Swiss-Prot record:
Family: Belongs to the chaperonin (HSP60) family.
Entry protein name: Chaperonin GroEL
Top-rank lineage group of the source organism: Bacteria
GO cellular component terms attached to this protein's record: cytoplasm
Binding positions for ATP per the UniProt entry: 30-33, 51, 87-91, 415, 479-481, 495
Length: 548
């Protein structure tokens, strides 16, 4: 086991503090509309240029192990804020730095770190409550566009596209971000339920020009197992053919004799049909087939449920207004399922979302929910170069997260103003002693820091701006983009309340933990051993004197 180096008291906090500052100083140059970019070297490919706080934080590893501990703790603040709120990572980092910097001075002066932590916790609790009263719900598409614009670094195109996407697919809808082939950033909305499986044979195509199969008012058969024999399917096929309606077969697979017979019947014009593989795998496939059945008003043919393919009738099939199948995707538009059945299914999926502990499962459940109730929107991000594409995609994802947070918990004045507005409630906090009061004062000073930094990045004196904003009321604040003092809500400079809240809570949590640290332990760097000198001469060749 490698030997350890142990630092105590002032020395430990000093090293941690240096690490915190190195990371925070790299991150905070990105804050606000006039914030700068950071360029990050990559071991392969072109460098990344970003204005996203968490991307910068994640790249930082310091050589000194104790300094690195401090940096990693603050990195945790940025990551956690990004995971929960999706934005506000730079604000959270700046708050953590300010809380720790002020706290370290007081601990060095002999104050009790545990009492300071209690004071910090009381102050944050009070501020979070007040933030709730300051927040207003998002009223319209315009406000959503403003939030998206601010989070995307004042890019109105991105803000408007996100607002349009949210208007089309609703709160429950899924919005994904993809890389576009061209330079334009566009929005594509898929109506109805879409899943990523296409036709099993190109012979099913009805439009050879577009290479798609489009069926109007089709019956939809959902089968859990493979279909390889024709005899099981014959009864239901005959019933559908008599009614002269198209048929969509969604099964684990359709192969051999069954697929060949379907293709022949399609080519002869006996039956308009298309066969598609079921989406997903394992239990998720069963659940998705059930979703399709509920949406279309059909029944899943499953031996687990005691339903066999040879015994089903047309009454067990679902229907929809239209089904479009291409090489890679199937879209079911306007399924004929009963609204109460769909609502019950949605309620069940929501309960599963609340219960699951896996982020992956939650994401997949939300996708299923969106397909049932909302829809799916795809934002195709276009750019001239790969470097610009990465940077733009980051901004779109940030903006998307911020708008979701705003819809969830409402909005507050942006640009660091919300923290200044709520700071007055700190006068009502009742600390138990002077050390707790010092903790409250740390927060009072720290929450001014985001506004100071935004002003500083825009080329203004932070202290003057803070005083002027403090003298104002409600939404009055500093618009760093224009350099004006105005009503920020009217000017469209707004932040999601959730982002503002999470940034403060996470920053206070990690910074106060760092403050209560008295000892730091890290592995000693191994002393580099000098390489041994190569042996001289050609030893071992004696005894050759007898050669002439």
């Amino acid at each position: 086991m490698a030997s350890k180096e142990i630092l105590f008291d002032v020395k430990a906090r000093e090293k941690l503090s240096r690490g915190v500052d190195k990371l925070a100083n790299a991150v905070k140059v990105t804050l606000g509309p006039k914030g700068r970019n950071v360029v990050i070297e990559k071991s392969f490919g072109s460098p990344v240029i970003t204005k996203d706080g968490v991307t910068v934080a994640k790249e930082i590893e310091l050589e000194d192990k104790f300094e690195n501990m401090g940096a990693q703790m603050v990195k945790e603040v940025a990551s956690k804020t990004s995971d929960i709120a999706g934005d506000g990572t730079t604000t959270a980092t700046i708050l953590a730095q300010a809380i720790y910097r002020e706290g370290v001075k007081l601990v060095a002066a002999g104050r009790s770190p545990m009492a300071i932590k209690r004071g910090i916790d009381k102050a944050v609790e009070k501020l979070v409550k007040e933030l709730g009263t300051l927040a207003k719900p998002t009223r319209d598409q315009k406000e959503i566009a403003q939030i998206g614009t601010i989070s995307a670094n004042s890019d109105t195109t991105i803000g408007n596209i996100i607002a349009e996407a949210m208007a089309k697919v609703g709160k429950e809808g899924v919005i994904t971000v993809e890389e576009a082939k061209g330079l334009e950033t566009t929005l594509e909305v898929v109506e109805g339920m879409q899943f990523d499986r296409g036709y099993l044979s190109p012979y099913f195509v009805t439009d050879p020009e577009k290479m798609i199969c489009e069926l109007d008012e089709p019956f939809i058969l959902c089968n859990e197992k493979k279909i390889s024999s024709m005899k099981d399917m014959l009864p239901v096929l005959e019933q559908v053919a008599k009614m002269n309606r198209p048929l969509v077969i969604i099964a684990e697979d359709v192969e051999g004799e069954a697929l060949a017979t379907l293709v022949v019947n399609k080519l002869r014009g006996t039956l308009q049909v298309v066969a598609v593989k079921a989406p997903g795998f394992g239990d998720r496939r069963k659940a998705m087939l059930q979703d399709i059945a509920v949406l279309t008003g059909g029944t899943v043919v499953s031996e687990d449920m005691g339903v066999k393919l040879e015994n089903i009738s047309v009454a067990d099939l679902g229907t929809a207004k239209r089904v479009v199948v291409d090489k890679e995707n199937t879209t079911i538009v306007d399924g004929a399922g009963k609204s109460e059945d769909i609502k019950a299914r949605v309620k069940q999926i929501r309960a599963q979302i609340d219960e699951t502990t896996s982020d992956y499962d939650r994401e997949k459940l939300q996708e299923r929910l969106a397909k049932l109730v909302g829809g799916v929107a795809v934002i195709n991000v276009g750019a001239a170069t790969e470097t610009e594409m990465k940077e733009k995609k980051d901004r779109v994802e940030d903006a998307l997260n911020a708008t979701r947070a705003a819809v969830e918990e409402g909005i507050v004045p942006g640009g660091g103003t919300a923290y200044i507005r709520i700071s007055r409630v700190l006068d009502d906090v009742k600390p138990a002693d002077d050390d707790e009061a010092a903790g409250v004062n740390i927060i009072r000073r720290a929450i001014e820091e985001p506004l100071r930094q935004i002003s500083s990045n825009a080329g203004y004196e932070g202290s003057i701006v803070v005083e002027k904003v403090r003298d104002g009321k409600d939404g009055f604040g500093f618009n760093a983009a224009s350099g004006e003092f105005e009503d920020l809500i009217k000017a469209g400079v707004i932040d999601p309340k959730k982002v503002t809240r999470i940034a403060l809570q996470n920053a206070a949590s990690v910074a106060s933990l760092l403050l209560t640290t008295e000892c730091a332990i890290a592995e000693k760097p191994e002393a580099k051993k000098d390489m041994p000198m190569p042996g001289g001469g050609m030893g071992g060749m004696g005894g050759m004197g007898g050669m002439y």
